[in-house]
Amino acid sequence: MKKKVLSVLLSVAMISTLLVGCGSGGSADSADAPADGGNSDDAVTTASSDGAEEITWMFWDDLNATEDLISIGYKDVVDRFNKDYEGKYHVTPITTNLEEYYTKLNALVASDETPDVFIVSPGPNLDVYVDPGVAADLTDDLKADGWMDTFNGGEGAFSQQTYDGKIYAVPLNIAAACVFYNTEMFEKAGISTMPTDWDGFIDACDKLQSAGYTPLSISAGTAWCLSMLAGYLCDAEGVDLDAIDAGTAHWTDSNVVTAANKMLELSKYFQPTAAGDTNDVATANFYNEEAAMLIQGSWAIAQINGSNPEFEDKCGVFAFPGTNGRVIAKSDSLAMSAKTEHKEAALAFMKYFTDDTAQKYTAEVGGKIPVTKVDYDADKAPAQLAYVMDVFSNASSTFGFYNESLASTEAGSTFDDAMVSIYLGTPVEEGLQTIEDFYVNNVWNK
């Protein structure tokens, strides 16, 4: 059965909201990497020696070693581009891990070696490249040949990538933060109805624990994973980030305290090694059936199915409980260096990520929601994608990662660190005071 993605299930208004809360110009079917900025994935494609125009692209995964299906799809984009433009253009990836990505990208920017194209998350993580003029204005390029018209929602698809009316990045896919669960463990624990509120969630955890299972796998070693959970809890308690930015609400308010205490209440159901486990380890705990649930973005579908294909049949998905239908949504995006000397090559490469081949792969293999109007075969897509689409179709609204939605990247990092610190034993009020102090010194008095 063929489905036109999002145009049936999601309205244009919803797709615009998703990206705020978070045909092609290339083939529809079809540079010198700095020494200290990351690894050059020369094995992805043979480096050009035929005089082709060289560009670089920086990404947060090892394209040669990865089992992540979305990353494997990006590797295919690189290979297709280099093959199709052989003798004219050639792209060399610069790769690192996610935890070190922005540190290494910023080092390249500071040394005036910004990659021609680089992946970025919208929000403050993109602001820091827009404000100093590192990222190029892509507005005219998107409108010039109908590229923008291929996106669901047209210009609305670029809401979170737009600053002062100009577009600085191109979204590649959409994902939602959900609760993944082991259907067999839930059945054996006597859970037949998925929890929709906090009390139901705690009750499910109790039943799983009583049945001998670790209820939740999560990473506090990778701070944003714990922070994502905290963001859901804060939003459920009515924390208003606009009011906090304006100084009319505070990080020490009772609703934030309640959210932090709920995080601690839930933490008794985490795996014993959560404090040191990385995101990859926590995810592996789930797909290796060492825990019953994983609170993670739907980008994890590619990692779960790529690492353990047999687990797909027993992997269910439900919306995080108690949020009144609100869902965390996120999109990976591509930016182009404002100083690139290879603009046409860079744009041609970027268009390959949103052509029909790449976007079909996004849904049919990677399990993420495409951003274009591409038709995809729902029967080929991972089973979990349909569950995520159900979460989106029932969403009342969406919002972004807290660490990407605060006043600055530094504010986001402060929030992340405070949540980890509270989990590790810092008293709630003391931990929240560190965020409050940051805002006093860096946001409200500026």
Language model region names:
Residues 58-60, 67, 76-77, 228, ...:
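Extracytoplasmic/periplasmic substrate-binding proteins
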